[in-house]
Amino acid sequence: MSQSPKVGFVSLGCPKALVDSEQIITQLRAEGYEISGSYDGADLVVVNTCGFIDEAVQESLDAIGEALTENGKVIVTGCLGAKSSASGSNLIEEVHPKVLAVTGPHAVGEVMQAVHSHLPKPHDPFVDLVPAAGIKLTPRHYAYLKISEGCNHRCTFCIIPSMRGDLVSRPVAEVMLEAENLFKSGVKELLVISQDTSAYGVDVKYRTGFWNGKPIKTRMTDLVAALGELAAQYGAWVRLHYVYPYPSVDEVIPLMAEGPFKGHVLPYLDVPFQHAHPEVLKRMKRPANAEKVLERVQKWREICPDLTIRSTFIAGFPGETEEQFETLLDFIREAELDRVGCFAYSPVEGATANDLDGALPDEVREERRARFMEVAEEVSANRMQRKIGKTLKVLIDEVSAEGGIGRTAADAPEIDGVVYVEPAAKASKRYKVGDFVSVKITGADGHDLWGEV
């Protein structure tokens, strides 16, 4: 029997791009292609790119160039594939004219067509080798679940809609089937992602779908409840990311705090507030009522005292005054957000914010970002200290002779903190990657925790 054709794969960018990569690799394996771990062992290479900020664009272009140098046969997909150069031509084809094909994001069919054109699929694929959950690039015990593509917002600093298009929600039955297959495969934590999780179903007017004969509206609250019910059957977690602060978010908080989904729909919200001053938010084309946001945060915590709120912000946006920046710092102190990231504003080619007046010097933007993070880290450290002495449920991510490393309900992988657990030899019971263990917290800093099983 002839040897199966081999495809190399490079995946860059955010978790949503990672899911695109997983879907492409799943289809490749389903058709009998093998995935090569090296350039020289591959018959061709697929590069999934990011094009959100200038650094990501350069990283993607460099990765394409490296793949061309090391292999020579390269197919490009992802957000950068939808980006034009200053001359109006495709940026990738202009910089790297030797690539075999270029597609935009979430284009599994187009990528497979390009692969077929340059590397025909084998006649006898081993379909049974592909698990129902698909091929995942994350560790076996957690996975990302993408529920929609695109975004209907037109934030002035963002070009995602120009690359990924308007919101397109996945059918609820399709989402639930993928979630079930993931839980069956041993996944202990599902991280729900999209460009705008709160808007799930807006594009289909919240139509009713069916899962195992049960009606479920294509709507965030209904989907989260269904996922929570499913997660409870497997003793697993569901974590919500990219939750735009719509009023509908208020309906999800009780699912985290009480009833059958408590402990499965995690008390964790990733909400991108971006700023707190109404004038800056207006220039960003974001919701512009910080006082109402503070009231909602307080209400959420009254309903769900264990709630962890993560958010991201932009410092040094065009036109931002020192007074407006101080308003942002006051908001961080008063809201007491648990996990916070901040970017110094950086112009993105194609973003309408580039046309705004009041651009700030690089040193001012960076200085404000640094001041922001000082305040945010102080707030985080104070909140982390309150956890000392508590016993928390921890999902183990790593185990070594030095002990275990895991995460609580307050910690998403890659972006939040971890819990350093005492060495396994001293633990009251053995544990392995993917296990849930109860850990008594003995120490904390501004980011991480230490504890004993």
UniProtKB/Swiss-Prot annotation:
Pfam families: Radical_SAM, TRAM_2, UPF0004. GO terms for molecular function: 4 iron, 4 sulfur cluster binding; aspartic acid methylthiotransferase activity; metal ion binding; protein methylthiotransferase activity. InterPro entries: Elp3/MiaA/NifB-like_rSAM, Methylthiotransferase, Methylthiotransferase_CS, Methylthiotransferase_N, Methylthiotransferase_N_sf, NA-bd_OB-fold, Ribosomal_uS12_MeSTrfase_RimO, rSAM. The keyword Metal-binding applies. Residues 385-453 form the TRAM domain. GO terms for biological process: tRNA modification. [4Fe-4S] cluster 2 binds at C151, C155, C158. It comes from the Bacteria. Catalyzes the methylthiolation of an aspartic acid residue of ribosomal protein uS12. It comes from Burkholderia orbicola (strain MC0-3). [4Fe-4S] cluster 1 binds at C14, C50, C79. This is Ribosomal protein uS12 methylthiotransferase RimO. PROSITE patterns: MTTASE_N (PS51449), MTTASE_RADICAL (PS01278), RADICAL_SAM (PS51918), TRAM (PS50926). Residues 5-120 form the MTTase N-terminal domain. Binds 2 [4Fe-4S] clusters. One cluster is coordinated with 3 cysteines and an exchangeable S-adenosyl-L-methionine. SUPFAM superfamilies: Radical SAM enzymes. It is found in: Cytoplasm.
